[in-house]
Amino acid sequence: MAAKNIKYNEEARKKIHKGVKTLAEAVKVTLGPKGRHVVIDKSFGSPQVTKDGVTVAKEIELEDKHENMGAQMVKEVASKTADKAGDGTTTATVLAEAIYSEGLRNVTAGANPMDLKRGIDKAVKVVVDELKKISKPVQHHKEIAQVATISANNDSEIGNLIAEAMEKVGKNGSITVEEAKGFETVLDVVEGMNFNRGYLSSYFSTNPETQECVLEDALILIYDKKISGIKDFLPVLQQVAESGRPLLIIAEEIEGEALATLVVNRLRAGFRVCAVKAPGFGDRRKAMLEDIAILTGGQLVSEELGMKLENTTLAMLGKAKKVIVTKEDTTIVEGLGNKPDIQARCDNIKKQIEDSTSDYDKEKLQERLAKLSGGVAVIRVGAATEIEMKEKKDRVDDAQHATIAAVEEGILPGGGTALVRCIPTLEAFLPMLANEDEAIGTRIILKALTAPLKQIASNAGKEGAIICQQVLARSANEGYDALRDAYTDMIDAGILDPTKVTRSALESAASIAGLLLTTEALIADIPEEKSSSAPAMPSAGMDY
């Protein structure tokens, strides 16, 4: 076991503080509409230019092991906030540094760290309750666009695209961000249930030019096993042919005699039919087939449930207004399923998302929910250079997460105003604390609440303390618009922050800063000295 280097008490806290400060200084320059960029060197490829707090934080690793511990703990603040709300990472870092710096001053002066932490926790609870009171729900397309615009560093093009995407796919829909091949940033929306399985034979296409198979008012057979023989398959085919409606077949595999029969009937008899493989694999495949069955009002024909293919009736088939199948994917538009059943299925998937601990599972469940409830929107980000495109993509990601957070918990006046508006409530709470050190902990939060506003003003070239005094002297929603250097009603001006983002930033910052304040010793490996001697040269007479 390697020898350890241990720091105690004051020395330990100073090392942590230096690490916290080093990381925070790099991150907080990005805050606000006049925040600057940070350029990150990469071991290969071009440097990365970003204004995203968590991206900057993740790149920081300090040489001194004890200082690095402080930096890594604050990095955790940014990561936790990103995980919870998807945005607000820079605000969280600014708050964490403010809470720890002020707390450290009081611990050095003799305050009890455990009581300080209790006071900090109580104060945070009061502030969070107040934020929830002043929060207002997002009601209009315009407000969604404003939230996205602010989060995308005042880029209204991105804000409007995200608002349009949200409007088209709904709050449960999926919005994904991809890199475009051209200069333009565009929005593509796929409405209805879409999965990446195309037709099994090009003979199924109904349009030779587009190579698409379009089935109007279609019936859908959903089967979870292979179909290879025609005998079991014939009864249901005859019923569909008699009904005169087109048929989409989704099965694990359709091959041999069965596929040949379908192709022959399509070409010679004009039977409008298309066969595709079931999406997904294993248990996920079965779940997706059940989703399709519920969406289309049909039944999954499964031998596990005692059903046989030869006994399938028209009543067991799903129905949809339109089905579009290309060689790569299938889209079911306007499935005619029972609305309460679809809603119950969505609620069940939401519950699974909440209970899941795997990020991969959550992502796949979210995809299923989006396909069932609204659709999928893809924002393709374009720019003149790859570096600019990556920077823009970061901003689109932030804006997308901020928008989802706003829809979930509502909005607050932005620009650090909401936190400043909680100061009177926290001041009223102070006399209720009997313990002096707990009261000091609450005062630490009181002071920290002004830190984001001061930093936004500082990044805009103004004196933070003066701006803060001016905002405190004004009424509820009035704050400082750093972009225009004016005091204005933040809600009317469209400068909004999602409640979830502000709440998560404060909670994460207070949690980690509280832990750092109660730290009394640091243990780190002693770095091994690297040998600078050159390797021995082989002697001249050696054989090779």
Curated annotation (Swiss-Prot):
Quaternary organization: Forms a cylinder of 14 subunits composed of two heptameric rings stacked back-to-back. Interacts with the co-chaperonin GroES.
Primary residence: cytoplasm
HAMAP family: CH60
Entry's Gene Ontology BP terms: positive regulation of non-canonical NF-kappaB signal transduction; protein refolding; regulation of entry of bacterium into host cell
Subcellular location: Cytoplasm
Stored SUPFAM superfamilies: GroEL apical domain-like (SSF52029), GroEL equatorial domain-like (SSF48592), GroEL-intermediate domain like (SSF54849)
Reactions that this protein is recorded to catalyse: ATP + H2O + a folded polypeptide = ADP + phosphate + an unfolded polypeptide
GO function terms (MF aspect): ATP binding; ATP-dependent protein folding chaperone; isomerase activity; unfolded protein binding
Role: Together with its co-chaperonin GroES, plays an essential role in assisting protein folding. The GroEL-GroES system forms a nano-cage that allows encapsulation of the non-native substrate proteins and provides a physical environment optimized to promote and accelerate protein folding.
Domain of life of the organism encoding this protein: Bacteria
Record field: transmembrane: none
Homology family: Belongs to the chaperonin (HSP60) family.
Pfam families: Cpn60_TCP1
UniProt protein name: Chaperonin GroEL 1
NCBIfam families: GroEL, PRK00013.1, PRK12849.1, PRK12850.1, PRK12851.1
Annotated GO CC locations: cell surface; cytoplasm; symbiont-containing vacuole
Alphabetical keyword list: ATP-binding, Chaperone, Cytoplasm, Isomerase, Nucleotide-binding, Stress response
Top EC group: isomerase
EC number of this enzyme: 5.6.1.7
Induction of the gene: By stress.
Residues noted as binding ATP in the record, renumbered to the chain: 30-33, 51, 87-91, 415, 481-483, 497
